Amino acid sequence: MRNFDLSPLMRQWIGFDKLANALQNAGESQSFPPYNIEKSDDNHYRITLALAGFRQEDLEIQLEGTRLSVKGTPEQPKEEKKWLHQGLMNQPFSLSFTLAENMEVSGATFVNGLLHIDLIRNEPEPIAAQRIAISERPALNS
């Protein structure tokens, strides 16, 4: 029996839990910046991006429809450096997530090199049935 991990595919689909469980595995996911997607409960999620070396003004978060985009453009050093080892990335990036229909961004914070984007699922109130009265005379005069 084989087990397949579909989480790399579904990491960028937030709020589609049943779909995430049904799909699992396909393709490579973007490796920079590293990020986590945390589910607190059925209605609260948090995306955390590790952005060492970035400043708050280097970052932009945009929500367009159900597409959440995060972009980072770090200030480039004035002079070229010679690295003996470079393990920290300080490069521009663009990352996007597709949110479920009723997901909204409730806030974002940038603390100690971690960008936290909080999401909430707002389930719409079901529309109550409306009773229509039937009159004795026709609605249209013919």
UniProtKB/Swiss-Prot annotation:
Pfam families: HSP20. GO terms for molecular function: identical protein binding. CDD domains: ACD_IbpA-B_like. Its main location: cytoplasm. Residues 26-137 form the sHSP domain. Thermostable up to 50 degrees Celsius. One of its GO terms (cellular component) is cytoplasm. Homodimer. Forms homomultimers of about 100-150 subunits at optimal growth temperatures. Conformation changes to oligomers at high temperatures or high ionic concentrations. The decrease in size of the multimers is accompanied by an increase in chaperone activity. The N- and C-terminal flexible termini are involved in oligomerization and in the binding of non-native substrate proteins, and are essential for chaperone activity. Associates with aggregated proteins, together with IbpA, to stabilize and protect them from irreversible denaturation and extensive proteolysis during heat shock and oxidative stress. Aggregated proteins bound to the IbpAB complex are more efficiently refolded and reactivated by the ATP-dependent chaperone systems ClpB and DnaK/DnaJ/GrpE. Its activity is ATP-independent. NCBIfam families: PRK11597.1. PANTHER family: PTHR47062, SMALL HEAT SHOCK PROTEIN IBPB (PTHR47062:SF2). Belongs to the small heat shock protein (HSP20) family. This is Small heat shock protein IbpB. It comes from Escherichia coli (strain K12).
